[in-house]
Amino acid sequence: MAVPKRRMSRSNTRSRRAQWKAKPTELVGVTVAGQQHKVPRRLLKAARLGLIDLDRR
């Protein structure tokens, strides 16, 4: 793992951190029991198997 050679100032640290932005989760359409739902891609299999309640909002 890389180790910094010198201490980074608070200003530089916060400026670097400010560049990072969270992206909204991309939703994918899935049909369950004849109804169309949009779920995150990582939950597709669980939605198809009925492990998560899609009617609850």
From Swiss-Prot:
GO CC terms, sorted: large ribosomal subunit
Keywords: Ribonucleoprotein, Ribosomal protein
Chain intervals for the UniProt region annotation (Disordered): 1-22
GO molecular function annotations of the record: structural constituent of ribosome
Segments of skewed composition (Basic residues): 1-20
Any one GO BP annotation for this protein: translation
Domain of life: Bacteria
Family matches, as Pfam families: Ribosomal_L32p
Protein family membership: Belongs to the bacterial ribosomal protein bL32 family.
Protein name in the entry: Large ribosomal subunit protein bL32
Organism listed in the record: Mycobacterium sp. (strain KMS)
